[in-house]
Regions:
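Stable alpha-helical elements in mature extracytoplasmic
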Residues: 71, 83, 115-118, 122, ...
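Short acidic (Asp/Glu) patches
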Residues: 86-88, 120, 162
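Mid-length scaffold segments of soluble, non-membrane domains
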Residues: 93-147
Length: 225
């Protein structure tokens, strides 16, 4: 009798220990992982990068907040197949990375690792007219600018959705920024919602109508036709 009682006393702690050990994984499995804030990279392939914070807010209507659930990127104008793409559809193609420095006419600059799709690939998907002269870009806040079709199709110009390996923040132009390399910052349109292929080579965007060069080349004058 004493031997059975001793066995019972010994087994009870063991049972509780097993129950306790078995319950921990279940409790842990029930917890969802906590999503932490994405951290930008500050160097890439040996090159130092600026921060996403090294920009000045100078948009015409303040920071825009685009709802990804309702966002559409329209590709229209002189195309055979007009497109209205969700964010997922827009980036569901070959993605590219490139370090490009944005230079503002205000005198500051920022060197960023951009990631996105080639504008040319989007134009090809829509069946653009190669005889067209101009591509007009429109932003969520109504801002517009234009660039020659030859510039966009002859160079690896990106429509970026990431900078320094993090999604572009609202204040930097989410969901898309045009990486208009070798052009002044006012050509780097943010919050892009529409890409229109046109024959209107005389089109002037917001800053161009206010005296800035329509060419926007870093090697050319800031002001002028």
């Amino acid at each position: 009798m004493m031997r059975h009682r001793a066995s019972l006393v010994f087994l009870l702690p063991l049972v509780f220990a097993l129950v306790s050990c078995g319950s921990k994984p279940a409790a842990q499995a029930a917890k969802e992982p906590v999503t932490l804030r994405a951290v930008e990279v500050r160097s890439y392939n040996g090159a130092d990068l600026s921060s996403v914070n090294d920009f000045r807010e100078n948009s015409i209507e303040g920071v825009q907040h685009v709802d990804p659930a309702t966002y559409r990127l329209e590709i229209a104008g002189l195309v055979s197949t007009p497109l209205s793409l969700t964010l997922g559809q827009a980036i569901d193609r070959t993605l590219y990375r490139k370090i490009v420095t944005l230079r503002c006419v205000e005198g500051w600059d920022a060197t960023i690792l951009w990631e996105g799709v080639k504008v040319k690939d989007l134009l090809v998907a829509a069946g653009y007219d190669p005889k067209a002269s101009t591509v007009i870009f429109t932003a969520y806040d109504g801002y517009t600018t234009s660039l020659p079709l030859a510039y966009l199709t002859g160079n690896d110009i990106l429509l970026a959705y990431k900078m320094n390996e993090i999604p572009i923040p609202d204040e930097r132009g989410y969901p898309f920024v045009l990486v208009a390399e070798d052009k002044w910052g006012y050509k780097w349109i943010k919050w892009v919602t529409k890409i229109e292929v046109s024959n209107d080579a005389s089109y002037r965007g917001y800053w161009e109508m206010n005296g800035y060069s329509n060419d926007g080349s870093l090697m050319g004058p800031i002001f002028g036709p």
